[in-house]
Amino acid sequence: QRFCGSSCHLSGELTLFGFEKALQKLSAALVFEGEKVTDWSASVSLVPGIQTLSFSLEIPEVKLWNPRGHGEQPLYQLHVISMDENNRLSDERIFSVGFRSVHFLPCAGSKDALPYQVQINGKSIYLKGVNYLPPEMSQADITRERLEKLLGNIADANCNLIRIWGGAYIGSEDLYDICDRLGILVWQEFLQSSSGIDNVPSKDPYFLQQLEETARAAIPRLRTHPSLLLYSGGNELTDGEGTPADFRDENIALLQRLVQTLDSRCMLPTSASGPNEFLDLNTPGKNHDVHGPWKYGGVEEHYTLYNQSDSLLHSEFGVDGMANLSALKRILSPEHLTVTNMRENIVWRHRGELWDTYDRTVSIFGSFLPEDLSDFIMCSQYIQAEGLRYALEANRRRAFANCGSIVWQYNEPCPNVSGTNLEDYYGEKKLGYYFVQNAFRPLTPSLRYEKLLWNPGEYGDFRAAILNDSECFKGSLLIEARSYEGELLFSKKSAVLVPENENLMLTPFSIAIPDSPALTIFLTLMGDSTDAPPIVSEYVFFTKGPDGTAQRSVAVALYEKYKK
């Protein structure tokens, strides 16, 4: 595609398979909503074997494809027909085509970093993504209906990108077709990933041959999709010292040459692309494209990490939480449907050893009886949701010094007892889904704070912000703080004017923590137009009881409120 004002030049290459000498009449017609926009035709004398033929089309007043949340996704159909000299049909193919311009710019204030800021059709796009895993271990078991539901849920969570992780496999045509239609950008990794043995990309000649064959087959199939944003050499690939691999690596250089030859899109050497592989506050200025952590850092430490982060792109991180009770009842026998941990219960360990949240949940909410499994799940999932929401909003408050967040992970390919997923194997959403959905709203009020668990009588420092990916907003923000019993402790209403695709930070404020099970701060954003409903963000802070823990009934009530 090449743009000139409001028109576009589309060029393509047809690959023809001839079985014998014959004259073929070829045509290509671009159609939009049933009406032909432009066409091309030619005749060619086929010979046995493979031939290629270039064609080009001029599209006046082209309609641009936009990522989700930033406009419509108009799709054209390219009809390619081959007929013999007697006008009998030899072959016919129909391709879906979308037109958009893509540029990659440096993140604000970044130096010596790869360009991670995505600009589509002249507008900077903050990446709000999730890491997508195959919903089944075998691709043959994945139906289009399953993908429609899964990707529809991702779109409803206000996501505009999926990262197809290098430890998975390249998806079916259905996957990319649905992303085209929904406006979900695709970060496509080649099929390489870190392992427990070695993260250095293989240089074995036979492996490199297979890698090249796979890439040569995949790139021409994927490159026609407007949703395809970029390629990556793979997941968490490094050199021998543990530094993220770059294009000097023989393996990665091979893939780069193939992308440059077969497509014109951006390619990252790997993800994380460094120079740090993992987010590290001790090495500021080196957290460009980073991964991790995948755990809730603690009732204070988690907030310190994300308040001080200087990541340019946070392409993989998460927080773990227990599976839904309905899922556990399908995979565990009755004797294992009890509160336990993965040190003591090998069945639980087999279904999620790395994601044991027992110690974390008990340290925040106190002890649980064996029969308190439902409450335990709700408290575990609440911390997962809270931790994710804070990380996403903290990164987004720094847009475009930070250019995107990609949650690990959206779904799971098999059922587990605990994990970092937002939707379980059976298609039921965890609490974290709803918190991510709110954090990714195009326009949403947000709150900066220092910790989750407080002593009564302490003073907490807070700062509200308005995060805006959309058009200019004019209205007011109402800040209210209430005790768990409903007593109004603080109220302030401010007129706000938020520029298009920019954030607005408001004046900090302080509140004395009440002698109550919890403090709730409501941020209510109201437009000057009475037509739009208010946008509300709710933040709950726990207070320590006599034993130093939070009252778990507060978390249980919040879980039940969101999951209704």
Please identify what each model-predicted range represents:
Residues 81, 174, 178-184, 221, ...:
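Alpha-helical structural signal in soluble globular domains
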Residues 105, 134-137, 169-172, 195-196, ...:
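Flexible loop/turn segments at secondary-structure boundaries
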Residues 121, 128, 165, 187-189, ...:
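Generic beta-strand/beta-sheet core signal
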Residues 195-200, 436:
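Short, charged, surface-exposed secondary-structure boundary motifs
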Residues 202-278, 427:
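Active-site neighborhood of glycoside hydrolase catalytic domains
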Residues 231, 268, 275-278, 295-474, ...:
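Substrate-binding clefts and catalytic carboxylate motifs of secreted carbohydrate-active enzymes
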